[in-house]
């Protein structure tokens, strides 16, 4: 049976969490005191919120952490009845561990309705002796102020490139293979600060039997940087038909969607040597194209319009 690497290599202690030194130091101080407040972990996907909560539970409860930590996903449990019944029933039960409390980890808490959050606030107050809540969310602004004021808020940033690279090298060494420099660059690029995504892509390319930039971009649904560079160059220089031919190849032969291409263009433009003025205009054009495609417009028409816009941008002098 294939073991999922994101679980196999999940941190077992707070010291193994990369890139969150300030948050980790705070959590370690809570562990030393054997007491934690309610917590709110805020940050984008793959920044280590769940891993940090589990590592905290392991350090507090040791081998019995699974019996003393309840994980729930608020996107599946977002109704007020769930708060009034299921979560309340869990919170009221006093655990048998020496610390006298358990952890209830509520992932995607920003998916809870405001009404459900208000009910949850009351549950937090009543059962704070037996249950410590850890909320995880992408957007702290979607958490009502009464809950924010009752938690210690910790913000998780995208994982720095060097930490992603280090973790992937550790996994490769443990699994008995090597990652060349170009492939590592591609892995770091497509992960965009998301450690979970980086590990999943690494396992996918390893399982495919080919660890290469081409395979990485293929698996993730990214156009290769070479094709993107050629397409932008042709478009900006007014070579509409040539740019369109490259886009057609990405759609037909590479199997990419319009959104895949737009997001690949965005990733490339952000780090390219294009002039700042052109970069601003191109990113605005990409945002417009993405919005229209997401709203249901035809991919091909929107990509043609995007190429035309790039040609218009290129025709202007700085």
Swiss-Prot record:
The entry's function note states:
Part of the RFC clamp loader complex which loads the PCNA sliding clamp onto DNA.
Please report the name of this protein according to its UniProt entry. Answer: Replication factor C small subunit
Describe its partners and assembly state: Heteromultimer composed of small subunits (RfcS) and large subunits (RfcL).
Q: Which Gene3D superfamilies match?
A: 1.10.8.60, 1.20.272.10, P-loop containing nucleotide triphosphate hydrolases
> Gene encoding it?
rfcS
GO biological process terms held by the UniProt record: DNA repair; DNA-templated DNA replication
Say if the entry is tagged with keyword ATP-binding: yes
Q: Which positions in this protein are listed as binding ATP?
A: 43-50
To which protein family does this belong? Belongs to the activator 1 small subunits family. RfcS subfamily.
Q: Which GO CC annotations does the UniProt entry carry?
A: DNA replication factor C complex
UniProt key word Nucleotide-binding: yes
Q: Name one GO molecular function term.
A: ATP binding
Record SMART domains: AAA (SM00382)
What is the superkingdom listed in this entry's lineage? Archaea
